[in-house]
Amino acid sequence: MPADDYPVTELTKALIARPSVTPLDEGCQTLMAERLSAIGFNIEPMVFEDTTNMWARRGNEGPVFCFAGHTDVVPTGDVSRWHTPPFVPTIIDGYLYGRGAADMKGSLAAMIIATERFVAKHPDHHGSIAFLITSDEEGPFINGTTRVIDTLEARNEKITWALVGEPSSTLKLGDVVKNGRRGSLTGNLTVKGIQGHVAYPHLADNPIHKAAPFLAELSQMHWDNGNEFFPPTSFQIANINGGTGASNVIPGALDVMFNFRYSTEVSADILIERVEALLKAHELDYDISWIFNGLPFLTGDGPLLDATRIAIRQVTGYETDPQTTGGTSDGRFIAPTGAKVLELGPVNATIHKVNECVKVDDLEQLALCYEVILEQLLC
């Protein structure tokens, strides 16, 4: 069968054609639900404010294997820079172009096709298969996966293994899987001063001058050495804003936003304690608030990682490399429940860019990998 005609290709195209920019779903989950319902899944829509979520499950017993993903996509950017319209899926030279092709409608289609094939071969499979799908992964992540997990936890419905379809691969399909992620902690700091005329500094108090030594020391601090699974904790200043825009006014306040990506060697509480101790040491007048974006998690050797290694080896012929690098994903909301979480998806070279694309052959290989993982865990 030509790659253009693979069922996974056709389903990916159907999903791309729905312009589901966060928090819109545009019928993607309805399309998925129709396919899953036809093979015995119970479909449970969970709509929270502007976000569409779906919990679908086949089976009532454990263990529970869950495909997790998102139907929302990031904005297209300047449409004139795209080779083809971003929501008109187009195949050129073996690549399928369109917003969401790699992140992550290709993965969603591969999950559906793999599950259909698996259920057809193993209608009486062990345990349960579930889908946790949201339209709020690329946005504020308030009413998406985290709300679904809260609902499941409230009724003691547990996920044993979760496979997130984030585009984990770097150079070729399956060369990298994410078996963990660093924690993410954001600080919003306001350093207070006294506004005044630059010609009369003795009548003002410049918060930029006051904060500069603190920020210099903070940016040079050593947080930890990392470990065999995680690189050392990193600190980055993301935004600094101060002043009125005029050259003759000393500002009354300085706003700084910064972020930690931290390993399992430290906790958010330790990072907060060290930052606030340094603020006090510099005798700054300040307000600070903290946003917890996710705890670090790690899935070590065990059934899920073993099954994924076997699947990638069997389908591609090479070994995968488990890593914890990169940004956060919705896996950070699933892992605290005790579930083992992995991420496996297409090559990520074009995600969030203009001309986002995925290799058509990779979509079929990804579906095959997902199917083998199901067989390894539920047969």
From Swiss-Prot:
Q: Which cofactor does it need?
A: Zn(2+); Co(2+)
Assigned EC number: 3.5.1.18
Residues involved in Zn(2+) 1 binding: H70, D103, E166
Give the residues the record marks as binding Zn(2+) 2: D103, E138, H352
Pathway where this protein functions? Amino-acid biosynthesis; L-lysine biosynthesis via DAP pathway; LL-2,6-diaminopimelate from (S)-tetrahydrodipicolinate (succinylase route): step 3/3
Catalysed reaction equations from the record: N-succinyl-(2S,6S)-2,6-diaminopimelate + H2O = (2S,6S)-2,6-diaminopimelate + succinate
Say which domain of life the source belongs to. Answer: Bacteria
Q: Does the keyword ATP-binding apply?
A: no
Keywords carried by this UniProt record = Amino-acid biosynthesis, Cobalt, Diaminopimelate biosynthesis, Hydrolase, Lysine biosynthesis, Metal-binding, Zinc
Q: Name one GO molecular function term.
A: acetylornithine deacetylase activity
- Cofactor binding description: Binds 2 Zn(2+) or Co(2+) ions per subunit.
| Active-site feature positions | D72, E137
Per its UniProt entry, what is the enzyme's top EC class, as one word? hydrolase
- GO BP terms: diaminopimelate biosynthetic process; L-arginine biosynthetic process; lysine biosynthetic process via diaminopimelate
Family assignment from sequence similarity: Belongs to the peptidase M20A family. DapE subfamily.
Instruction: Report quaternary structure and partners.
Output: Homodimer.
- The protein's role, per its UniProt record: Catalyzes the hydrolysis of N-succinyl-L,L-diaminopimelic acid (SDAP), forming succinate and LL-2,6-diaminopimelate (DAP), an intermediate involved in the bacterial biosynthesis of lysine and meso-diaminopimelic acid, an essential component of bacterial cell walls.
What is this protein called in UniProt?
Answer: Succinyl-diaminopimelate desuccinylase
Q: Which organism is it from?
A: Shewanella baltica (strain OS195)
Which gene name does the record give? Answer: dapE
